[in-house]
A protein has these predicted regions:
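Predominantly the C-terminal beta-signal and adjacent terminal strand-loop region
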Residues: 152-216
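Outer-membrane beta-barrel biogenesis signature
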Residues: 19-35, 215-216
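Surface-exposed strand-loop-strand hairpins of Gram-negative outer-membrane beta-barrel proteins
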Residues: 37-63
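Sec-dependent N-terminal signal peptides
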Residues: 4-15
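Gram-negative (and chloroplast) outer-membrane scaffold detector with strong preference
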Residues: 29, 40, 65-147, 155-161, ...
Length: 216
């Protein structure tokens, strides 16, 4: 996996450095993005899983994304995220790949912008936990249909290079809430402390980081 990540970063860097556009604004045709940052998990699991044993431990996120712009304010793309959390010898990691729809607002002659993205794809979660005097540990792996939301701020640096501050939320394991209701039947607005939303999920990751974008 480390070799795959290294190879992917190399390919993206090579492709990015060979984009010969000299435009003095953010990409409006196509772009290649790679970056990373912190990953803040919120995972509810069973009594033996990584997060219940070690808490919602902070990890890191590595990401790559390709975008094709139909309009300066609208694009489609493909994004891949790799997340890793560890409390040695226990460790957990996640692979998530999905197509994205991106909406963007530009200003300052196209040199700055904000974006919002929505994606649905495949999420593969794996963890290995150990108990005392156990060498092999307990391996758990499961695939999910993941839903992601992203937003961020883009700024032009020079030529075909721009920077990006971004926030992504990755979610999975959604289910219908058995306690769901449309409205509070209590006329006084009493809050019973129970979540009555229609849908709930058990897996959420909040990723905050920085990325470099090459494109034209």
């Amino acid at each position: 996996m480390k070799r795959l990540i290294t190879f992917s970063v190399f390919i993206l860097t090579f492709c990015g450095m060979n984009i010969q556009a000299q435009s003095e604004c953010l990409p409006q045709k196509y772009s290649i993005i790679f970056g990373g940052g912190l990953s803040l998990p919120y995972v509810e699991g069973n009594r033996n899983d990584f997060f219940n044993k070690n808490g919602n431990r902070v990890g890191y996120d590595l990401m790559t994304e390709g975008r094709y712009y139909f309009l300066p304010n609208f694009a489609v793309g493909v994004q891949y995220d790799y997340l890793r959390m560890a409390c040695l010898p226990d460790k957990a990691h996640l692979h998530y790949i999905r197509p994205n729809i991106i909406f963007r607002h530009l200003w300052s002659n196209g040199n700055q912008g904000t974006f919002f993205s929505l994606g649905i794809g495949y999420m593969d979660y794996q963890e290995r936990t150990y108990t005392r005097d156990q060498r092999r540990g307990h391996l758990f792996q499961k695939g999910y249909c993941g839903i992601s939301f992203g937003m961020g701020y883009e700024f032009h640096i020079k030529y075909n290079l721009s920077g990006m501050l971004r926030f992504d939320m990755l979610t999975a394991d959604w289910f219908a809430n058995p306690d769901a209701r449309l409205f509070n039947p209590d006329p006084d607005g009493y809050d019973d402390g129970i979540d009555h939303s229609w849908f709930k999920n058990n897996i959420t990751f909040f990723n905050l980081g920085f990325a470099l974008q090459f494109g034209r």
